[in-house]
Amino acid sequence: MIVGVPREMSAGERRVSLVPSAVQVLVKAGLEVLVEAGAGEAAGYPDPAFVARGAALVSREDVFARADIVLQVRGPGAGTGAAAADLAMYRPGQVVIAMHDPLGAPEMVKELAARGVTAFSLELVPRITRAQSMDVLSSMATVAGYQAVLVAAETLPQLFPMLMTAAGTLAPAKVFVVGVGVAGLQAIATAKRLGAVVEAYDVRPAVKDQVLSVGAKFVEFDLETEGAEDKG
């Protein structure tokens, strides 16, 4: 069986669907891995790193023409611009594992089905223990929460931590996080580490303990929340 890894074509996309260490695992399992030249460059994985782990470097056309399973970060539905052009290269019987955004781009999914392609949409994998290793949303949400605070810290015209100097004292920044899912919790933790005073709110009262556990204050409002879920 052949696994193919094409370079991501969506504007601004720097991720790669398979890293060199994972290539080695697949090769040891008896699979052949084809990687488009330059697929991992933007993510910090040069071509020699893939070759050293057993992958073969090929053209984009060869990846789609030869691979039984195509691994992508964004499928044609979730991609933008040039990524949608990949649609014409999928062939009947091929399996595509990626984030496809089937609810946002149902026409793309219908086109894949019409071509006889089997598509697995990773963002729809349920958040259960058995599927934890395939939970792409939680890992990306963690990065998003972290990055959001870094952007805020760079944009805010004051420093995050309290600083005491001979010239006086600078009060810490106050951060308010709305929504305490995976991204929210990471944002809280990052802001706290940078020295800010952090408060957070979520419609789910059950997350109060999680907020307190990362050192923030949970803000409560007198709202009807009986129907709120207890998971983020």
Please provide the spans of the model-predicted regions.
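Short, acidic/turn-prone active-site loops that include or flank metal/cofactor-
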Residues: 63, 101-103, 124-126, 204, ...
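Short, basic, helix/turn surface patches
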Residues: 58-69, 144-155, 224-232
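Short, hinge-like loop/turn segments at secondary-structure boundaries
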Residues: 50-54, 136-140, 215-220
